Amino acid sequence: MGCTASKVEQEDTVRRCKERRRHMKEAVASRQQLASAHADYLRSLRLTAAALSRFAQGHPSLAVSHHTAPVLLTTAAPALAPTPTPPPPSSTASSSLPPPTPLLPKHQQAPPPPPPTQSHQPPPPVAVRAPRGGPRRLKVPHILSDSSVASPARSSFRKPVVGTPSSSSAWDWENFYPPSPPDSEFFDRRKADLEEANRLRELEEEEKARGYLHPHHLKEEDEVDDDDDEREEEMHCGGWEDDDDHYASTTTSETRSEEGEMGNRSECGFAARSEYGGTAPSEYAAAPLPLPLRRRDERSEAGDSSSTVTAAAEMRMVIRHRTLAEIVAAIEEYFVKAAEAGNGVSELLEASRAQLDRNFRQLKKTVYHSNSLLSSLSSTWTSKPPLAVRYKLDTNALEMESMEGKSHGSTLERLLAWEKKLYQEVKARESVKIEHEKKLSTLQSLEYRGRDSTKLDKTKASINKLQSLIIVTSQAATTTSSAIVRVRDNELAPQLVELCFALLSMWRSMNHFHEIQNEIVQQVRGLVDNSMAESTSDLHRLATRDLEAAVSAWHSNFNRLIKYQRDYIRALYGWLKLTLFQVDSNIPQEAYTSLISRELTTFCDEWKQALDRLPDASASEAIKSFVNVVHVIYTKQAEEMKIKKRTETYSKELEKKTNSLRAIEKKYYQSYSMVGLGLPGSGRDGIESHSFDARDPLAEKKTEIAQCRRKVEDEMTRHAKAVEVTRSMTLNNIQTGLPGMFQAIAGFSGTVVEALDVVCRRAGSVR
């Protein structure tokens, strides 16, 4: 029997199924360890931030030098979707365009754009955010005098349109786009708008002849503030009068002939274009800028002069922190953001307790109390301790869970159960086949020898029975294998792709936050210690110890995260590679495997190779070196505290001896200053005299006090030197260790993003 069992284990099919079971078992265990390591890594980021903040708060004297250059942070806004470039408007169309939208009022005007540079490129439109509560208006600058040769005349002509809280726009007549989107009445109003524009042009010409411009088309409530508005317009847009040459040079001849002054006087306006006309969303176009340096792409030279390309805006902020505590506070904020970036992966890996409890919804909990029977689907406990708690499987919850979709962990658990079942079935099938071969040999021997026919019939009956068992076991193995293939292709494949994309998103966000931290932390190179005499306290030492423990945990969890992720993908790849073979090895691979299985195997192979190529050793060494740096600081603080304690001990001893000497002097000499003088009544003829007594009984005690005082002074000198060494060591180690750690972790996260980006491109074929 043992020989038969060993022979079954040596079969290729059985060995392959055993390897599949082992790989899936490793994948399930690695997934659990990866979820735990991922949760611990996110937790260690928060703990490191808190410990670093407590450490920095204990060193308020570490200030940033005034000679240190500030940090320039560039935060790119989300890129806007490219908008299609419409064809340039024809002359007839431009002459019958609808009126432009109203602009912002004077009290909520956006700051004017900077003056154009010396280049001859047209300036980009400046987007502003409209207020809540209704449309706004803004007066454009007064027209220039006719004596200006380089610029055509301008007017403060206004036209009303509807403004929304999210966006507002004014027409840029040099590069005109139709409104977005035109309503059904657009073409009906074209003729009326053209007539209105001609009438207003005639009125403006009459007013220009009188030397001033009066806005006839404004509402009555706006006429009261015309004088104040005009004064503010001159202050707000006065710097634009020098740019008329530049603005006039960008106007095409067709626009100048058809629109005339209407195109020129709208050049001062602010434009925010929509999807059809290029309107940017208000949250991107009018983001608050402490130091506003917005950059837009130049106008496209490949298209017509009326087509523009607006790129995603970038916000640059110049940051200067004053102390180490402020630097660490800024770093702590991005530590928290980096930890929050991993929540999506935690959901997929089921790393939180809430997700673990969610998997037990199919269990109905019954709590037995002394006075009542409470039945609830939730796991909420009552205030009284129960007598007994029993769980029962709820089939309705199982059906609901199957309809909602399985989690990644449950998918792997079911695959492991299927693999165990498949291994037993294949093993049983192969053992039946071996027994069948033995019976065939026996039958052949009996027929050859011509023995008793009864034995021959029994052997044939056994062979028929074994053949039936072979068919049944083969069908069972085929059914189980088909179930595994179905779960692999329909559930596991999309879950792995989703996990890969979630990891890419997490590391991309972490890389962004670590890059900002790396920029901010460069300021520690300019730290100076304004108080070198400040000694270390117990709170400082505890904060340093907590920082060392937190960074050490970060280092350990970082290594665990990378290790278990590699183990997980390696186990999955090994299992997927074996699933490409049919349970029955006689069938060729191409006839069995599907396209999605081959693509999924290739996808996991590239994922495994990308993880193997990651330079995690450099990042791990950088974090470990910072742990060593903090440990050195902690050691120096311990030495300083030891010297301080010894100094305090000697000081107490000196104080004790001094007090004892003063007590003796007070008792026997009745004075603190009679030491070394004669005793009372020792003079001749009973005359009191104070002569020096060479036989001072307290000379020995005074000598001891002098020696103790010298010890105290020596220890105080050592303590002062130890304080200076500790402060200097702390400053130097922070300046060298902290930037190196953030530089390494930022570089590693960037490498992970590049590697996973290549892997995710391969995921398209898996989907």
UniProtKB/Swiss-Prot annotation:
One Pfam family linked to the record: DUF632
Biased composition (Basic and acidic residues): 201-210, 255-264
Principal localisation: membrane
Ranges of compositional bias, category Acidic residues: 221-232
Cellular component GO terms held in the UniProt record: plasma membrane
Tissue and organ distribution: Highly expressed in young leaves and panicles. Expressed at low levels in roots.
Topological relation to the membrane, as annotated: Peripheral membrane protein
Residue ranges with Pro residues bias: 81-90, 110-126
Bias (Low complexity): 145-155
A Gene Ontology biological process term: cell differentiation
Residues covered by region (Disordered): 1-20, 78-187, 201-309
UniProt keyword terms in alphabetical order: Cell membrane, Developmental protein, Differentiation, Membrane
Top-level taxon of the source organism: Eukaryota
Gene deletion effect: Adaxially rolling and erect leaves which leads to plants with erect architecture and reduced lamina joint angle. Abnormal bulliform cell number, size and arrangement in leaf blades. Dark-green leaves with increased levels of chlorophylls. Reduced number of tillers, altered grain morphology, and reduced number of grains per main panicle. Reduced number and length of adventitious roots.
Statement: the UniProt record of this protein carries the keyword Cell membrane: yes
Subcellular localization(s) per the UniProt record: Cell membrane
Functional note: Involved in the regulation of leaf shape formation. May function by coordinating the expression of genes associated with leaf and bulliform cell development.
PANTHER family membership: BZIP DOMAIN CLASS TRANSCRIPTION FACTOR (DUF630 AND DUF632)-RELATED, PROTEIN ALTERED PHOSPHATE STARVATION RESPONSE 1
Protein name: Protein ROLLING AND ERECT LEAF 2
Organism of origin: Oryza sativa subsp. japonica
